[in-house]
């Protein structure tokens, strides 16, 4: 009798969970079943979960055979190895913050890298989490000898820079978070981004509303210029993706 009672106590909760999954599958996608099963009540976590699912679907559709990497530094190194940075081609990063990424790439070459950042934080709110001024850097980060920092807002610093540096872009790392900032980059550098240019996006996908950020600015750039791209890698544990323009 005791064993029967114990078995009933164990089985009933499992049955209840199975019914909850079944009901969820009837009501919506599998992702909702996962949330219901976990008892998730955080709106942020729920939105992140949905972003993960939409990112997975994008990867399966647009880059099913593209090799992924386990971390951002690995993607930067892989992308840089495929970039043509010979002659007067420009190597640049937009969104330096504390200098970790640009220093990582700088170790891979003796050429000069240009890092653009206002160092005053976000120019506007980003999503429902980050506020204007977040990511403020009180003083310029320490960078390697082959890195030149260009301090200021992109729309103010890029025009004079491009007048002085006439080469095409060989390698571009976009880490500016905001759609507006990314749009500014693509508008001002449009003629310098050519077939063969390698671009690494730091926030391409896998976060809530990723379709409205760097991803959107890039799609608009492709539509305007009639260029295409080939994915050359992505971070399977993060938000980064790398492309080469065609």
PLM regions and their residue ranges:
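S-adenosylmethionine/decaboxylated-SAM
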Residues: 56-58, 77, 85-246
């Amino acid at each position: 009798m005791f064993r029967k009672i114990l078995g009933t106590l164990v089985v009933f909760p499992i049955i209840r969970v199975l019914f909850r999954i079944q009901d969820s599958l009837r009501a919506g996608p599998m992702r909702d079943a996962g949330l219901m099963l976990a008892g998730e009540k955080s709106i942020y976590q729920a939105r992140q979960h949905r972003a993960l699912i939409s990112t997975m679907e994008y990867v399966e559709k647009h880059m099913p055979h593209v090799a992924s990497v386990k971390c951002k530094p690995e993607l930067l190194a892989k992308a840089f190895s495929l970039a043509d940075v010979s002659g007067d081609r420009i190597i640049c990063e937009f969104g330096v913050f504390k200098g970790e990424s640009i220093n990582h790439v700088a170790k891979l070459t003796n050429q000069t890298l240009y890092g653009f950042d206002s160092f005053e934080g976000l120019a506007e709110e980003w999503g429902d989490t980050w506020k204007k001024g977040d990511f403020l850097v009180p003083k310029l980060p320490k960078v390697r000898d082959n890195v030149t920092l260009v301090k200021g807002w992109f729309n103010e610093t890029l025009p004079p820079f491009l007048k002085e540096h006439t080469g095409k872009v060989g390698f571009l790392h976009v880490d500016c978070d905001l759609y507006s900032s990314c749009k500014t980059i693509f508008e001002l550098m449009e003629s310098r981004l050519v077939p063969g240019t390698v671009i690494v996006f730091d926030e391409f996908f896998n976060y809530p509303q990723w379709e409205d950020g760097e991803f959107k600015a890039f799609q608009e750039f492709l539509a305007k210029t009639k260029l295409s791209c080939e994915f050359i890698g992505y971070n399977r544990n993060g938000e980064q993706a790398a492309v080469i323009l065609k």
